[in-house]
């Protein structure tokens, strides 16, 4: 790893065999864990997780790829840059630029990327904004942000409460999450389809700790505010211009989750 990278001092609960680094990208620092050899593969997590969501998958992928598991800005051990009234520092466009810079510091100018949930949105924005950097892309449990808002109904609101709740003006969402971080994590991990026992105590504790950090709470809410405004506008602008992802793309979703029916509806248009 280049000497310019500043190694992070962390107590890991998983991925102990992966090298840890805190990479300066200009606007913030991005925490990564890296291992393996072969073509580079960037893995991006969702809410309310961190890079630890890949703890069971990344070691297997590292037998074939150079795997980089990153924390999005505002999440995990990455930096929490100050936001602005338009939430631009937490738009997926800014998060995608972080990943381009971080991978460049790791000397990867072109790479594959896979993202789940919020990370999937960063992944497809990365492929749209930086097509020469992305070799191929996989998105897991994701509809484009503009499409999700267009289709939003009562079922969506009840199943994906963070979308509208966390996008409310500060400080209400931050205060609500700060009051019951354990309940938020348990609902997210247990209520969104995870079988019992998948998340060990260390991983759960790491996720809860993030929601006890006021700066991270605000950053996460800013990311949702950006999704409801800037991210949606960026998607709509791309659609209006006919701008598309040009590299190979794999979209996967759970057959038993609500996204399944929405994908079927999209296919039927």
Task: Name every feature range the model reports, one short phrase each.
Residues 2-21, 28-30, 40, 68, ...:
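Flexible "cap/lid" subdomain of the alpha/beta-hydrolase fold that forms the substrate-access gate
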Residues 25-26, 34-35:
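Active-site beta-strand termini and strand-to-loop segments that position acidic
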Residues 36, 55-58, 79, 150:
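Short, flexible helix/strand-to-coil boundary loops that buttress conserved ligand/catalytic motifs
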Residues 39-45:
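Short beta-strand element of the alpha/beta-hydrolase
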Residues 48-56, 67:
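Serine-hydrolase catalytic-loop signature spanning alpha/beta hydrolases and amidase-signature enzymes
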Residues 53, 72-75:
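Recognition helices and adjacent regulatory flanks at domain boundaries
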Residues 56-65, 105:
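A short, Lys/Arg-enriched amphipathic alpha-helix followed by its capping loop at the start of a domain
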